[in-house]
Amino acid sequence: MVLQTLTVRDPLQPFGFVDVLYYYARVAPLLRNFLKGKPLATKIHLPRGNIPFFLRRAHVDGPLKIDDLLTDVDERLLKLRVNALADVRGQLTEKQQRIWSYFVPRKLIDFFYATNGEKIGGSLERIYFDIDRKGVDVDIAQEVTAALLDAIAEDTQFRDVAGSFKFFVLWTGNSFHVYLLLKKPMPASFYEKFIAYTKDDPLRSFTGRWAAAIAKNVYQKTQGGHEKKQGWITIDPSQSPSGKLARCPFSLHVSDADSYDGIALPVDIMKLRGTTLIKDLKNYTPKTVLDHLDSFKRLLP
């Protein structure tokens, strides 16, 4: 049975127990282009014990792609997941067993992907900046995000070295990611030469120069880099290189093993300065996301 025709009361408990696979399989068709060829990854949260979570990713657990959720997840598989995997393994294909291991039933799971592939030193098809807001109001993060887009768009020197690109903005459930989707892939050295932030020479990179301009004109405690500081906005590009992970659109933003506090959603750039944007994004639930998939489709690359 095609999952798009299978409606349930609670997308995170489609058959009476927590199982996020139904929800992620339902949003998968919208992600085919954005995640084309990208290895998937998941962060599975554990309710007790010394290990709070574990990761599944391609180079350790075998590759999984977004199309696998379209072709191999059906109602039969979802109903089998009331059982232990060991008891039904013989009824599953090898790919379904891998999907099961990435999306373990009865667990809350963050949905990620390899930003520029798993292979270390691979080329860059996209660059993204995490707008980290440690202890800073989310409205300020929104303002900084809008200012970063303006700074990049107005930087002719950057366009000279990067070529054409498209913006994509993602609300992570807690803050924002700003993507530059490059028309022409760049070698791995492009990141180190032009994007990577260093404290010893902060204005060497475009990241540092943009952060400095925003600190001067928008929010004084804005910095570039990976190191998070209480009360500061950090513009962090460090998850851009190949081998690093990024949050998928529509991922739950899991706060602990028993709860999530937001959903990653595509943002209409034209509304990025809107006064109700954050409230509107926070009001979405998994069910209302599925009810409004058509409205999100136009916002995805």
Feature roles, as predicted:
Residues L124-F129, S164-I195, L245-P249:
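Histidine-centered divalent-metal-coordination microenvironment in nucleic-acid enzymes
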Residues G121-D139:
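Short glycine-/aliphatic-rich beta-strand segments at the starts of folded cytosolic domains
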Residues V138-F158:
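A short, contiguous, amphipathic alpha-helix enriched in charged residues
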Residues M1-E125, A188, Q223-S259, I269-G274, ...:
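DNA replication initiation on ssDNA origins
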Residues I195-R209, D236-S240, R247:
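C-terminal, helix-dominated tail/subdomain
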